[in-house]
Amino acid sequence: DKIPNFVVPGKCASVDRNKLWAEQTPNRNSYAGVWYQFALTNNPYQLIEKCVRNEYSFDGKQFVIKSTGIAYDGNLLKRNGKLYPNPFGEPHLSIDYENSFAAPLVILETDYSNYACLYSCIDYNFGYHSDFSFIFSRSANLADQYVKKCEAAFKNINVDTTRFVKTVQGSSCPYDTQKTV
């Protein structure tokens, strides 16, 4: 058996999840609305390549997510998911898309109205882990000042920001069609 290339030696970054959880819980409903994926690190679970648009609807307990965009085969793709507090009481969210598995997710930093820096990591046996990072924006573009805030947040937990790949967004994207899918 071969180890997938996204499973790497080392441990998940040290994140003060308790502090973030305490700060964000009162504002959680402010995360609702549309988020565009500005950039991400290598993630085999992200099946949408371009024009990634995420709609988060908060029902008081969890977010229902509708993610749309252009898949790697060039076709429009919709994925449904949920984002909810960890069911075992750990201070982080769990993200769970159809045909996948629930994974921990931490909002490292956000102002709720412009940007969000997201980190997901799972530690495995024998000193291996998988981590995935995202930069989200409320619009198809993200001002450099907010990109820098996310870069600083990721550098603060020793995530190599050169791993990020910018997501194609903008005038070539069928956002109006995506809203109706």
Curated annotation (Swiss-Prot):
Oligomer; Can form dimers (beta-crustacyanin); or complexes of 16 subunits (alpha-crustacyanin). There are five types of subunits: A1, A2, A3, C1 and C2. GO terms for cellular component: cytoplasm; extracellular region. GO terms for molecular function: pigment binding. This is Crustacyanin-A1 subunit. Its main location: secreted. The keyword Signal does not apply. It is found in: Secreted, Extracellular space. Found in the carapace. It holds the Pfam family Lipocalin. Binds the carotenoid astaxanthin (AXT) which provides the blue coloration to the carapace of the lobster. SUPFAM superfamilies: Lipocalins. Signal peptide: none annotated. Keywords: Chromophore, Disulfide bond, Pigment, Secreted, Transport. It comes from Homarus gammarus (European lobster).
